[in-house]
Amino acid sequence: MEMILITLCLTTLLALLLKSILKRTATKNFNLPPSPWRLPVIGNLHQLSLHTHRSLRSLSLRYGPLMLLHFGRTPVLIVSSADVAHDVMKTHDLVCANRPKTKVVDKILSGGRDVAFAPYGEYWRQMKSICIQNLLNNKMVRSYEKIREEEIKRMIEKLEKASCSSSPSPVNLSQILMTLTNDIICRVALGRKYSGKKDGIDVENIVRTFAALLGEFPVGEYIPSLSWIDRIRGLDHKMEVVDKRFDEFLERVVKEHEEADKETRSDLVDKLLTIQSDKTGQFELEKSALKLIIWDMFLAGTATTLSFLEWAMTELMRNPKVMKKLQEEIRSSSPQDLFVTEKEAEKMNYLQAVIKEALRLRPPAPLLVPRVLSEDVKLKGYNIPAGTQVIVNAWAIQRDTTTWGTDAEEFKPERHLDTNLDFQGQDFKFIPFGSGKRICPGIGFTSALIGVTLANIVKRFNWRMDVEPQRVQHDLTEATGLVVFRKFPLIAIPSSA
């Protein structure tokens, strides 16, 4: 009996190996990009670390800026240079505008019925248009300036309490910044702040968990026969919890707005409900889609902004000369006791250079949201078949020494002075928010918040990290996820300037 089982196992393994070899031989005729040797069944999954952007960059240094990997049976094109990114997101933008289906998106975002993950087409265009017209256009972004100012001032008051004593106490700056971004997006999108203690829901934790889930690699997604591993890892349970909790929260928010005075509608939910009730339009906004728009606003408005502010403050405290130079610019441009306005922040050259450098070195989403080819395409002389997923490694591109110089790994805002380089997606060596049709539509909203926040906390306080005496270096460990936060909170000590 044992010999029969052993024979069956060996036969199965040999069959898989033979199938893999035959498939690899057959694909040679397609003139595919360079690819590392892959294992049967799992493909190249064994070559990925928890910090996928780093392992993909290491592979690209060996196999080139355009390489083909296989996640299980799924072919995935990895883009790691500005030149190839230009071809993907400009030359072939329309062919590369679709999104692949994923387990997390299917479960939490109704199969990609939101803006960020919806398939390219009329539905996506209508949803994106609703977001831009009602929240993300320049006029709307400017109209929320007072909300941003009020919440930043509240944050400064909290920090002043920690800094005013003769012995300033450490603060969890990560948590303070998370509360700031969450409160602002709640007021803008939902009309009021939602506190976990007061309202019985921890929105901040849900957003963090969801951002982490989006960066997961569910084994069952690429190897269906091993989907049981996701259950053992607790991935399926996490998705269930996030989906249930946030849906309950959004149901309550929508109900509150439906029962409120309809004559005073002004926030995003109010506007979405007005659109939903209008049956004369060409596009009917379903309730589920309405909630998914709010989901996107939380992910983009809270997660990406927090990630930037966390890492920007980390780099400034690691580079005291840069911090001092920035403080000198801000403090000389604005009286110490006054709030730095958004217009003032926009005119501060070194501040803008610091923002660009932080986005270059620490893009909130190191790997841009994956795309999938809708038809065959030719890239750099290689033939890429339809259905291939495309991942642009913005983190690797923005640290490429061939375009940024030998000091690309260093935090040097000076590299952005006296240049017209911006992050609007037109220069493909600097694409922290993507480019082309699927560029992040919330760039303006995020930009308005990060500049004024950074200006005011750097102006009002002197900062240093709360580092244990025995530690020589600052902790720069990254969390995992689509949006990459610090793994451990940024604990810092503010002192009055």
UniProtKB/Swiss-Prot annotation:
Disulfide bridges in this chain: none
Membrane topology, from the record: Single-pass membrane protein
Known cofactor(s): heme
Keyword Ion transport: no
GO MF term list: heme binding; iron ion binding; monooxygenase activity; oxidoreductase activity, acting on paired donors, with incorporation or reduction of molecular oxygen
Broad class of enzyme this protein falls into: oxidoreductase
The protein's name in its UniProt record: Cytochrome P450 71A20
Protein encoded by which gene: CYP71A20
